């Protein structure tokens, strides 16, 4: 995540120039001068750069010690980063917390719950500083499991659910457990955030939008082969990964970050594909692929 994105500067710079130039030309023709056009150009550019200015302000804020201690205790990847990597990870956490909405249904939205989700986003984006989490979201917390009607149900099928449009729903209990046991390949935050990369295609198909189009067919073939292994019980991924391509991608992401050594040993081709996609090797924090 970046404070200033070059693409945004370029788009709003051109837009400000064109609109300002047109209004200035009209102003000169009408005898009122160019000042209105200049004012409009400034307003358009300032409006476009507002999110960058806000991020700049957020980045200048100190990172709370309590947050840092939580990351050290629950996110092994963060512990392995050098000082520069840690600061970037922390900054991404701050950006995420400032820009996303968090609400609770019968449960208090604690600082820990918010931080737990932000840590997942910072982890997924760490190897790609120029990436952003697709779309701003509301993260809705339930106390425990829920059913397909979004009612709390101790026997419900869901601990998390992401929508192409709409909130990401998470069980508060599952969020806490996901980080309490960081090496079991079961983390609802990473799972649901992974779905957001997939939803940009409109139809969740297990092929994330940010994947290089030239690699899409190879990834599709790899997914099919790995899903067969899951169905046959020859995979480190839990059986839920075989229910659909979208769920395969999400479960694979969980294991990539939580059990990288095991995934690399048992499924080297899958591991290398995810290393290329996320541009990092989670076995060695901070080591990007290029």
PLM regions with names:
Residues 1-2:
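Short, Lys/Arg-rich, polar N-terminal cytosolic tail immediately upstream
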Residues 82, 183-201, 250:
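Active-site recognition of the HExxH zinc-binding catalytic motif
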Residues 5-22, 82:
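Alpha-helical bilayer-embedded segments of polytopic membrane proteins, i.e.
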Residues 113, 181-186, 246:
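Hydrophobic (often cysteine-bearing) scaffold residues that line and stabilize catalytic clefts
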Residues 50-159, 163, 270-284:
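A metal-dependent hydrolase signature that marks the N-terminal structural subdomain at the beginning
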Residues 5-13, 50, 119-128, 144-180, ...:
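Metalloprotease/metallohydrolase-associated module, dominated by Zn2+-dependent proteases
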Residues 25-41:
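Hydrophobic alpha-helical transmembrane segments
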């Amino acid at each position: 995540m970046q404070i200033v994105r070059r693409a945004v500067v370029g788009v709003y710079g051109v837009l400000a120039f064109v609109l300002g130039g047109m209004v200035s030309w009209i102003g000169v023709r009408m005898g009122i001068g160019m000042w209105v056009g200049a004012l409009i150009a400034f307003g358009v550019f300032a409006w476009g750069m507002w999110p960058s200015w806000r991020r700049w302000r957020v980045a200048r804020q100190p990172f709370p010690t309590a947050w840092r201690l939580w990351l050290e205790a629950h996110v092994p990847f963060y512990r392995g980063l050098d000082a520069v990597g840690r600061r970037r990870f922390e900054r991404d956490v701050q950006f995420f917390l400032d820009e996303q909405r968090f609400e609770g249904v019968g449960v208090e939205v604690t600082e820990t719950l918010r931080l737990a989700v932000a840590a997942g986003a910072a982890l997924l984006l760490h190897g790609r500083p120029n990436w952003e989490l697709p779309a701003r979201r509301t993260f809705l917390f339930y106390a425990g499991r829920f059913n397909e009607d979004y009612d709390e149900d101790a026997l419900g099928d869901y601990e998390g659910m992401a929508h192409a449009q709409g909130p990401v729903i998470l069980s508060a209990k599952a969020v806490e457990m996901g980080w309490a046991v960081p090496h079991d390949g079961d983390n609802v935050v990473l799972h649901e955030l992974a779905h957001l990369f997939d939803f940009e295609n409109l139809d969740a198909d297990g092929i994330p939008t940010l994947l290089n189009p030239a690699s899409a067919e190879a990834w599709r073939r790899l997914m099919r082969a790995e899903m067969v292994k899951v169905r046959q019980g020859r995979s480190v991924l839990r059986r839920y990964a075989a229910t659909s391509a979208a769920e395969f991608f999400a479960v694979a992401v969980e294991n990539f970050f939580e059990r990288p050594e095991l995934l690399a040993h048992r499924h080297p081709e899958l591991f290398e594909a995810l290393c290329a996609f996320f541009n990092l090797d989670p076995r060695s924090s901070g080591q990007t692929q290029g």
